[in-house]
Amino acid sequence: MDNRFATAFVIACVLSLISTIYMAASIGTDFWYEYRSPVQENSSDLNKSIWDEFISDEADEKTYNDALFRYNGTVGLWRRCITIPKNMHWYSPPERTESFDVVTKCVSFTLTEQFMEKFVDPGNHNSGIDLLRTYLWRCQFLLPFVSLGLMCFGALIGLCACICRSLYPTIATGILHLLAGLCTLGSVSCYVAGIELLHQKLELPDSVSGEFGWSFCLACVSAPLQFMASALFIWAAHTNRKEYTLMKAYRVA
């Protein structure tokens, strides 16, 4: 194996490993989107009511998004989190202080919630199903797993190529990484589109701002890494095969 191809193969493996770590981290963390709002007063009946609704199994899209807006919420692919006062005194509000302890509480999306239909008017089950938002939501959490699966399968083929001391099978690895990159890019695009459509339905309060978090950024970085790894795998395998064929033809001649 030529040193050029071996170097390209090693670099592609490193890029693939980094992108896999980034993708896995983005799936497992809860900072795809973050809301920033004024810290709420400790101990109020409204706080308790919102928290109870937030953790309820029957919480609809509007209910938990209202809580996310109000309590500096963060959203991942599988969990939603809010920041609430650490010690809640439901019986009477304590005197206001400049600051008080807060704690982050998270609730996981159930598999049923992940596949649940989204409505044209969030929270209103009589408003009809919003098919676009429904399928965007489903794609945004399914595609990252497809991406990881493709990369793992590609890594297995690459391992077989190393055992066989041949670069040619890595063409399949490159193609799988290309498909993984497309899945990651599709997931990111679906998430952005879904957030924009949601905010058109549920406008943010004046005192609340929202931004994409670092988990989302990891997914965004993972996609180009997958594309670069794919290009290197395919180039190394194709060029090495081509040179081997030419050399074989030269020897025969």
Swiss-Prot record:
It is found in: Cell junction, Tight junction; Cell membrane. Glycans are attached at N42, N72. The keyword Glycoprotein applies. The keyword Cell membrane applies. It is a multi-pass membrane protein. GO terms for cellular component: membrane. Keywords: Cell junction, Cell membrane, Glycoprotein, Membrane, Tight junction, Transmembrane, Transmembrane helix. The chain crosses the membrane at residues 5-25, 141-161, 175-195, 216-236. Plays a role in negatively regulating the permeability of cells to small molecules. Belongs to the PMP-22/EMP/MP20 family. This is Claudin domain-containing protein 1. It comes from Macaca fascicularis (Crab-eating macaque). The lineage of its organism: Eukaryota, Metazoa, Chordata, Craniata, Vertebrata.
